[in-house]
Amino acid sequence: MSKGQSLQDPYLNILRKERIPVSIFLVNGIKLQGQIESFDQFVILLRNTVSQMVYKHAISTVVPSRNVRLPVQDPNAPAEEDS
């Protein structure tokens, strides 16, 4: 896992698993709302009345409808290596 993904993936995964409604603001100011159905390195699938594939490079901010707690990671734990 790359260091750039070490916060993003667990955060999006919690939003997906717990089906937390989110507002996603795009860089052009458009607001999308729904639940994260799936995601990968480049896109997020957002479900509302339909599924939308949103490219991450177009996203400015992801705002959950409630507070989200990430699992506490030991700062002394060895970093995961890319395989």
Swiss-Prot record:
PROSITE patterns: SM. InterPro entries: Hfq (IPR005001), LSM_dom_sf (IPR010920), Sm (IPR047575). SUPFAM superfamilies: Sm-like ribonucleoproteins. It comes from the Bacteria. GO terms for biological process: regulation of DNA-templated transcription; regulation of RNA stability; regulation of translation, ncRNA-mediated. One of its GO terms (cellular component) is cytosol. Residues 9-68 form the Sm domain. Disulfide bonds: none annotated. One of its GO terms (molecular function) is RNA binding. Keywords: RNA-binding, Stress response. RNA chaperone that binds small regulatory RNA (sRNAs) and mRNAs to facilitate mRNA translational regulation in response to envelope stress, environmental stress and changes in metabolite concentrations. Also binds with high specificity to tRNAs. Homohexamer. Belongs to the Hfq family. This is RNA-binding protein Hfq.
